[in-house]
C-alpha cells in the first residue's frame, strides 16, 4: 500500500474506500455463502435444554444456517492482502489472527454440527487453544514494540499512559493482561451472539470506537495499519447485518464471533487500549459478566441472579421481544462507544 494514503488530508478518503469495498464485498458474497452453508447442512444444532422457554422462543431458528462468520474471514483476509504490503510483519500478524481465530471457531461449529445435542469442543480445550493463539499474538506485538516507549507503558482511560517500569515483572504483568484481554474479548463476543443482529451491531460500534483510537494514536508503530483492519471489520459487520437482522437468514456462529472478538481484542492490545476496550465494548463486558456472576452465584449461593444468562436471555425470559432487546443493547453499545472515545481523547 502506498504510504501516501496516510497523509492527514487523505486519510478519511482512504478509510472510506476501504470501508466501501469491504461492505460491497460482504453484500455481494453474503447470498453465495448462505447457499453454500445450506447445501452443507450447517444449521444451528444447539439445544437450549437449560431453559425450556428459550427453546420455544427460538423454535423457528432451527433451520437457519450458522457458521456465517466465514464471510468475515473472506472479507478481512482479502482486505489486508489487498491494502497492506506483503513485506510488512503487521500484514502477516493480521493474517495469523484472522486465520487462527476463525479456524478455531470453524472447528467448534463443525463439532457442534456432528454432535447430536449440538455442543462443540470442551470449554477446557477451547480455552487452551485461545490462550495459545493469544500468547503468539501478544508475543509478536511485544516484539514489534520492543525498544519503543510503548513497550513500558499502559494506557489508562482518562489518565493517559502509565509506566509499567523497565523490570521483567512489569512485562510479565503486561503479557498476562494482554493475553487475557484477547481471550476475554473472544469469549465475550461469543456469548453476545445469541439474538438476531445483536453481536454484529454491537461490533460496529466497538470497532468504530477503536478506529477513532487508532487514527488518533500517531505514535504507535502499527497505527497506520490497524485502521485498515478495523475499517474492514466495520464494513463487513454492517453488510452482515443485511442477512443477520431479524428474522436472520444466517448466524455468524463461533466462526464469526470468535474471529470478531479476536480482532477487537488484538487491536486493543496493539493500541495499548486493553482497559479502554472495557468501556468501548461495555455490552460485551456486561454479557460475559452476567454469565460469570450466574455461575458463581449458582455454585456458592445455590441461587440464580438472572432468570437466564447471558443477559440478553434474561430479558427475553421476562417477556421482552427479541427485537426490543437488540435495540436496547445497541443503544447501550452506542453510549459505551461515545464514553470510550471521550475517555480515550481526554487529556
From Swiss-Prot:
Catalyzes the initial step of the lipid cycle reactions in the biosynthesis of the cell wall peptidoglycan: transfers peptidoglycan precursor phospho-MurNAc-pentapeptide from UDP-MurNAc-pentapeptide onto the lipid carrier undecaprenyl phosphate, yielding undecaprenyl-pyrophosphoryl-MurNAc-pentapeptide, known as lipid I. Its EC number is 2.7.8.13. This is Phospho-N-acetylmuramoyl-pentapeptide-transferase. It comes from the Bacteria. Its main location: membrane. Its cofactor is Mg(2+). Belongs to the glycosyltransferase 4 family. MraY subfamily. GO terms for molecular function: metal ion binding; phospho-N-acetylmuramoyl-pentapeptide-transferase activity; UDP-N-acetylmuramoyl-L-alanyl-D-glutamyl-meso-2,6-diaminopimelyl-D-alanyl-D-alanine:undecaprenyl-phosphate transferase activity. The lineage of its organism: Bacteria, Pseudomonadati, Chlamydiota, Chlamydiia, Chlamydiales. GO terms for cellular component: plasma membrane. Keywords: Cell cycle, Cell division, Cell inner membrane, Cell membrane, Cell shape, Cell wall biogenesis/degradation, Magnesium, Membrane, Metal-binding, Peptidoglycan synthesis, Transferase, Transmembrane, Transmembrane helix. The gene is mraY. One of its GO terms (biological process) is peptidoglycan biosynthetic process. Pathway: Cell wall biogenesis; peptidoglycan biosynthesis. The chain crosses the membrane at residues 10-30, 67-87, 91-111, 127-147, 164-184, 195-215, 220-240, 250-270, 275-295, 325-345. It is found in: Cell inner membrane. It is an enzyme of class 2 (transferase). It is a multi-pass membrane protein. It catalyses: UDP-N-acetyl-alpha-D-muramoyl-L-alanyl-gamma-D-glutamyl-meso-2,6-diaminopimeloyl-D-alanyl-D-alanine + di-trans,octa-cis-undecaprenyl phosphate = di-trans,octa-cis-undecaprenyl diphospho-N-acetyl-alpha-D-muramoyl-L-alanyl-D-glutamyl-meso-2,6-diaminopimeloyl-D-alanyl-D-alanine + UMP.
Amino acid at each position: 500500500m502506498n504510504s501516501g494514503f496516510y497523509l492527514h488530508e487523505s486519510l478519511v478518503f482512504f478509510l472510506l474506500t476501504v470501508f466501501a469495498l469491504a461492505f460491497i464485498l460482504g453484500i455481494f458474497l453474503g447470498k453465495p455463502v448462505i447457499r453454500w452453508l445450506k447445501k452443507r447442512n450447517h444449521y444451528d444444532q444447539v439445544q437450549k435444554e437449560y431453559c425450556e422457554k428459550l427453546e420455544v422462543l427460538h423454535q423457528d431458528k432451527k433451520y437457519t444456517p450458522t457458521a456465517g462468520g466465514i464471510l468475515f474471514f473472506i472479507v478481512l483476509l482479502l482486505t489486508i492482502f489487498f491494502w497492506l504490503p506483503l513485506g510488512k510483519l503487521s500484514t502477516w500478524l493480521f493474517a495469523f489472527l484472522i486465520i487462527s481465530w476463525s479456524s478455531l471457531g470453524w472447528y467448534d461449529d463443525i463439532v457442534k454440527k456432528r454432535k447430536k445435542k449440538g455442543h462443540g469442543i470442551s470449554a477446557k480445550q477451547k480455552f487452551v487453544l485461545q490462550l495459545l493463539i493469544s500468547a503468539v499474538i501478544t508475543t509478536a506485538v511485544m516484539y514489534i514494540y520492543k525498544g519503543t516507549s510503548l513497550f513500558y507503558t499502559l494506557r489508562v482511560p482518562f489518565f493517559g499512559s502509565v509506566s509499567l517500569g523497565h523490570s521483567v515483572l512489569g512485562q510479565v504483568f503486561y503479557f498476562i493482561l494482554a493475553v487475557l484481554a484477547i481471550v476475554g474479548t473472544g469469549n465475550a463476543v461469543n456469548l453476545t451472539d445469541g439474538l438476531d443482529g445483536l453481536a454484529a451491531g454491537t461490533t460496529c460500534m466497538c470497532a468504530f470506537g477503536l478506529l477513532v483510537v487508532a487514527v488518533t494514536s500517531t505514535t504507535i508503530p502499527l497505527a497506520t495499519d490497524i485502521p485498515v483492519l478495523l475499517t474492514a471489520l466495520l464494513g463487513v459487520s454492517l453488510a452482515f447485518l443485511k442477512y443477520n437482522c431479524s428474522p436472520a437468514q444466517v448466524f455468524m456462529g463461533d466462526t464469526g464471533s470468535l474471529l470478531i472478538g479476536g480482532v477487537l481484542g488484538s487491536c486493543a492490545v496493539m493500541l495499548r487500549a486493553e482497559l479502554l476496550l472495557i468501556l468501548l465494548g461495555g455490552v460485551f463486558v456486561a454479557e460475559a459478566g452476567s454469565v460469570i456472576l450466574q455461575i458463581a452465584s449458582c455454585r456458592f449461593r445455590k441461587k440464580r441472579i438472572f432468570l437466564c444468562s447471558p443477559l440478553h436471555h434474561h430479558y427475553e425470559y421476562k417477556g421482552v421481544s427479541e427485537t426490543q432487546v437488540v435495540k436496547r443493547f445497541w443503544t447501550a453499545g452506542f453510549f459505551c462507544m461515545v464514553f470510550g472515545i471521550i475517555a480515550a481523547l481526554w487529556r
